[in-house]
Design a protein with these regions (language model features):
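Pre-Walker A (Motif I) flank of P-loop NTPase domains
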Residues: 2-6, 108-109
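P-loop (Walker A) phosphate-binding loop of NTP-binding proteins
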Residues: 12
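Conserved substrate/cofactor phosphate-moiety recognition/catalytic segment
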Residues: 25-92
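ATP-binding Walker
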Residues: 15
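ATP-dependent NMP and nucleoside kinases share a basic, alpha-helical "lid"
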Residues: 101-111, 116-155
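Small-molecule kinase domains that catalyze NTP-dependent phosphoryl transfer to phosphate-bearing small molecules
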Residues: 144, 149-192, 199-201
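Hydrophobic anchor at the beta1->P-loop junction of P-loop NTPases
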Residues: 9
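Walker A/P-loop
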Residues: 18
Length: 201
């Protein structure tokens, strides 16, 4: 079986990407590193996101304007939908994610990249950074009602993030394999991804 240099795993918040990535890492004997979007975010000082990783972000200020702010985009009376607005400090960080993953791969470390493609620029960054590498792209989907139920149950996410990302993250790149965590168990999702690797020419 020809294992890829990078598993590029993309999906909305609360879709089960991290569970899938850790499951893949456990199931594959090769020494894959799991690197996540959130891992990079948490490298920054908390003042730049002030609880944007929690159920309620704190007040916006000059620092969050440079970092990340969770903006409600839905109209009054509609289900809450929230999107992230990245300032210049976080935009530099976001633009550095894929090149950092490339550096790990070039150092001999295959990577399972747990990503959230908020916009087209993030996809283009991956496309450029991973040029010449063997990449298997994995889309992680889930019905919106299940995403939102998970989001509420977790209690560590801004409510509305799942809805805000669900219709966005899958619009930027094609996938080699897609798994629906609303209908498949974590083990079945891992098996589907490994089967996609095995089926490649």
């Amino acid at each position: 079986m020809r294992w890829p240099d990078v598993f590029l795993v993309n999906g909305p918040s609360s879709a089960g990407k991290s569970t899938l990535c850790r499951g893949l890492q456990s199931a594959i004997e090769n020494s894959y590193l799991v690197v996540g979007f959130d891992d990079f975010i948490f490298m920054s000082a908390p003042r730049y996101y002030r609880g944007a990783d929690s159920a309620l972000q704190g007040a916006f200020d000059a620092y969050t304007a440079l970092g990340a702010e969770m903006i409600v985009t839905s109209r009054p009376g509609e289900p809450v939908s929230v999107t992230a607005r990245f300032g210049p400090v976080f935009r530099k960080l976001v633009d550095s994610m894929a090149p950092a993953v490339r550096a790990l791969v070039d150092g001999g470390n295959p990577v399972i990249f747990d990503h959230v493609l908020h916009d087209e620029a993030m996809y283009f960054s991956c496309e450029e950074a991973f040029a010449g590498l063997d990449v298997l792209s994995v889309g992680v989907t889930c019905p919106l009602e299940i995403l939102e139920a998970r989001e509420r149950a977790r209690g560590d996410r801004v409510l509305g993030r799942a809805r805000g990302l669900a219709d966005v993250v899958h619009t930027f790149m094609p996938y080699d394999v897609t798994v629906d965590t609303g209908t498949l168990s974590p083990e079945e999702c891992v098996a589907a991804v490994i089967a996609a690797v095995d089926a490649r020419p």
